[in-house]
């Protein structure tokens, strides 16, 4: 039975679970980093996980050691009161100082060594604690504590007292930064006198190289990059290397530039699409467009005044059976039934097929058609009795279509119309 579990990581490298990497692998990681390889490249070359490479390099940059820390136990506290007071002093002298600059000053002034120097995250935590204590304490208590930490007896009751030896409130920041720059020169002199001055200088240079600022491109470089971006948004590694040799930039910087440029292009394309949609959409909808001609068919113009009344309900007709019959029939052209047409008796099958359309009241044959006459024609229609054979009435077949029909004066039988409509 094995005491430890061995495995293979996602890159194909072998590791022992819970145990640190061998010293030979750690040394190779540092050597590759000094030669300029990126952590992701080191991870692929040595088949070590990216997190492990970053952790080893980060500890090497901070402490200069590649040895693993002790497994188990607690780390001794490195942010001692003396170190905290120095950090507060540096922050007062130059409020814009960075944590890694404070760390360098602690090393250069001999406050800490490589073994007990606090990390950048520890210094940031100390600065946050100082800021929170400043908010919790009152103004007087804060000034007393700062005077105690600074070891001075001057008056701290006013704002300019934060910067000793100065009279203009805006000047101390520059003086403090100048003092810090002077301390940086002392850093070089002190570290050069040490035993491991060369190694420390190499480590600091490598650290500065990794902690780079934003790349500033010249106009020629920007023009070359934009020209390549117009050709393709995704250049391959050969195109990037050719462009890197042409404009004297690292291939990694060119790759990052193209990634950022593609993101910018997507944002601009989104804005262009929004403007295009806004320009195509009308600002207001016309009133006429809300009524579609496919839904509402136009009603033909009436030929006679009587045809303006298109349904039985508008003429005072309360018989719903006839109203439904007229509205359900398709529109037909106007025609006239003459008196000489043969009077065919209704076929029983045809009569039964339209039995649902006729009223059940037996008085329908005896009703006159003056009910369908509009009010303004009552006088004219009353002067001509319906009993004469020459009287013409208008029957409504569908809305908007008038059918003048000659009705025999002897017997106005409704059943004569249905064979004609089939």
Swiss-Prot record:
Impact reported for residue 375 to Q: In AN1; reduced DNA binding ability
> Looking at the record, which segments are called PAI subdomain?
7-63
Q: For the region RED subdomain, what residue ranges are annotated?
A: 82-130
Impact after mutating residue 321 to T:
Shows about two-fold higher binding efficiency than the normal wild-type protein; transcriptional activation ability is about 89% of that of the wild-type protein
Output the Gene Ontology terms for molecular function. Answer: chromatin DNA binding; co-SMAD binding; DNA binding; DNA-binding transcription activator activity, RNA polymerase II-specific; DNA-binding transcription factor activity; DNA-binding transcription factor activity, RNA polymerase II-specific; DNA-binding transcription repressor activity, RNA polymerase II-specific; histone acetyltransferase binding
Changing residue 258 to S has the effect of: In MCOPCB12 and COLON; significant impairment of transcriptional activation ability
Query: Region Required for suppression of NFATC1-mediated transcription: what ranges?
Result: 345-422
- Describe the subunit structure: Interacts with MAF and MAFB. Interacts with TRIM11; this interaction leads to ubiquitination and proteasomal degradation, as well as inhibition of transactivation, possibly in part by preventing PAX6 binding to consensus DNA sequences. Interacts with TLE6/GRG6.
The similarity comment for this entry is: Belongs to the paired homeobox family.
Q: What name does the UniProt record give this protein?
A: Paired box protein Pax-6
Question: What does UniProt list as this organism's lineage?
Answer: Eukaryota, Metazoa, Chordata, Craniata, Vertebrata
Gene for this protein?
PAX6
